[in-house]
């Protein structure tokens, strides 16, 4: 069994080949580096392989020279629960377009098999792709539309399920686990990694943003429908197809009260940047159970570089403090980008952050970009 870590590439026909004699590399920040065995895990069965147009694969030759390979770089797109350690090593053509927002992960040949530069960080089988996109999904969407006629949220998440294959959306129709209730067409940040809205000159977004404002009654109808029967039921505001949910605080708060007037089952969650503290307070006071906060840095400079928001990191901290003080379970969705979060100044800032705000959980999430997209230095 070979101990060599070998680079791979894709030829002009899309065939994936190993680059004999070229050591496999990964990318952190804007630097290509050699991969080590401890960086690698076997490629998960449910992972996908994706070519990077106009990005040449890069490896290290036997004489130690880092050089491009005459073929396209290949990336692994990992299922939920995995966190990439390195991006694919590549050389970008000057005329290359920005790539769509996916968690591009280095993949190589090791022990005569495909391995990727990642770690398994979230042991939750519920997000395994095997549970989604089943042959009966289309009929389940039709059933729910008949049971909740005229509800625009159902129409929205039905499209998200069938067109964009969103797992959280699909759970509404499977009547289980966590389902999303999108509510806000607007946002108070301009994230580099926004998956629902990007400027025309940027990379294409992998989802379409909601174009309407659901009423409290529409919100409650979906919430009650789901929580009454779903095992481990959760309804979540703040989905990939919307902006910032706290900006819809009036309708969300009213919807939560209507839900809780009918059932105390399940959990009500919000995924949020929590930058608008007044909106967060209204939703917390209405009966929010849990709050997942999207965040990339505990330093103002690092935070602003990504979110480009109309609020400040201190507003985020104030919202988290209010939620913790009012018994809400708070977790962080920590956006991880190789070469950024692992810098010394970032780690030091997180130590201070957690001393001040002892949240209950940290979940690492991949930031969907390649290195040239985020300007942080």
Language-model-detected regions and their locations in the chain:
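N-terminal [4Fe-4S]-dependent radical SAM core
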Residues: 97, 102-181, 198-206, 218, ...
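Core AdoMet radical
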Residues: 178, 182, 198-279, 286-316, ...
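Short Lys/Arg-enriched alpha/beta "domain-start" segment
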Residues: 1-94, 100
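Short cysteine clusters
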Residues: 187, 191-194, 237
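Conserved C-terminal portion of the radical SAM core fold
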Residues: 314-373
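C-terminal helical cap(s) of enzyme catalytic domains, especially alpha/beta-barrels
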Residues: 375-377
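N-terminal cationic-hydrophobic initiation segments that often serve targeting/anchoring roles
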Residues: 114, 227, 260, 284, ...
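Short, well-ordered strand-loop elements centered on a beta-strand within folded domains, enriched
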Residues: 3-6, 16-19, 112-122, 273-275
